[in-house]
């Protein structure tokens, strides 16, 4: 209120005869029956709105009403075209205006010098509004977006207003909305939502203010030259641009408003782009479960090892003879381990300068050259892979010892491991694990599988070309690729062939079988041996007949139902986990010899298979 300047202004002198402004006091209170005390305030509009308002002054008032009503009122478009009506806004009561103004000033406070710079602009806006509204005294409109429900009346002036004191022909604006329009705070909506249609009720002050401030950035884009459809749409969404009271503002406030809305729209668009492409620094639900699907399951000694791509399985190129002897290489490595300087190493080994000794050491350990040195090969990689499980256990023991030293308490490695497990499941980001970890693990897993497949194809091609058995490295890589093999404790190594499934490399499916099915000739001999054993067991009266017959029957039954191995998986696993039957002494020499030979062959087949 202090921004009103009571000094003489030539722009005010010509219109003081119709309405005399009173100099307001500092503690003036708005009263609905004393509008002469209230100072009409102004709003800030964009420069494009100001130009269009000056160009659109000669337009008729009916078109003004048709363009303003859909923006401010809940009227369908059909009703606005046929029955243009005049709207009248009731004055806000005293108890509702004060908290709104106080909340607006507390939330969005504009510096006081900002208003002092614009006293002259406010006076000019007041006089221009008064001049425009004076020729049309019966078409007054009071704009106030603090009132949620507006009043639609057929008469231009309500009876309550005719009985009260004559009000000035000045559009009333709520002063509390100016800082909200001028503030540079972003819109509360996280995503740019479409503008609400005119049929939707505007019952909230926040929705009306948001929609009122949203089109600030879109008015410059549309421009003055619009088509008919674009004008209807803009009338529905953003209201009239060239009608109503004069919308004049300085260029500084226009640029602030436009930059605010443009920045807000840009930030919301960037947020939408980030939400479409999943950010890596955000952790989504079920991260530990998804991480378990990517990482190899323990024991880590059975995890697939990526073969070295640089190692060529074909014929290697001929290497040139080195000028360093193997003795010099060993001396260089040993002296470097002892901490000798390069000058001393060069003098002792006699290789020449210290640069030659340093370069030779780097070639030996693989730091330079074509990386074909024997410092690190696939054998070392496999050896390190076998140490992972034991190293994991030792790691937790070391953590437990260090924790006991620092806290003077007694913890076990199991307690430390369980506590870390709980902390990791609560917040994986505290361990540096996020979505980027899963993405990198998936890439590494795909690369390992692709490399193993390529190496297997190369091995098959070389085997088919040379008709020679594959080398040990490729066999080891093939065995490491079998991820579905179950872990078997070494103490059950005697029964490993009964518990381990046979890998079907063609289809990748596992078939659970107790023993390999015998050929037809051997099956016939088994039937003969079964008859002999029946005779022997009946003569001895032993109790092992039913057990031996049951095991042979299970073997025949598995041979008959080999096409459906998964149906009898549990039954065969129970039967195959039994220890081999004891040797039966027989009185018949031929039958006992055949039984003993058969059992020895079966035991050799069981024990000769490799576990690792």
Swiss-Prot record:
Residues 1-20, 46-68, 94-143, 179-273, 443-480, 497-527, 546-612 are annotated as: Disordered. Surface antigen mediating adhesion and aggregation in S.cerevisiae. The keyword DNA damage does not apply. Residues 230-240, 465-480, 497-512 have a biased composition (Polar residues). Residues 443-457 have a biased composition (Basic and acidic residues). The gene is ADF1. Keywords: Cell adhesion. It comes from Candida albicans (strain SC5314 / ATCC MYA-2876). Transmembrane segments: none annotated. The lineage of its organism: Eukaryota, Fungi, Dikarya, Ascomycota, Saccharomycotina. GO terms for biological process: adhesion of symbiont to host; cell adhesion; cell-cell adhesion; filamentous growth; regulation of DNA-templated transcription. Residues 1-18, 47-68, 94-106, 115-141, 182-203, 218-228, 254-272, 585-606 have a biased composition (Low complexity). This is Adherence factor. Residues 555-571 have a biased composition (Basic residues). It comes from the Eukaryota.
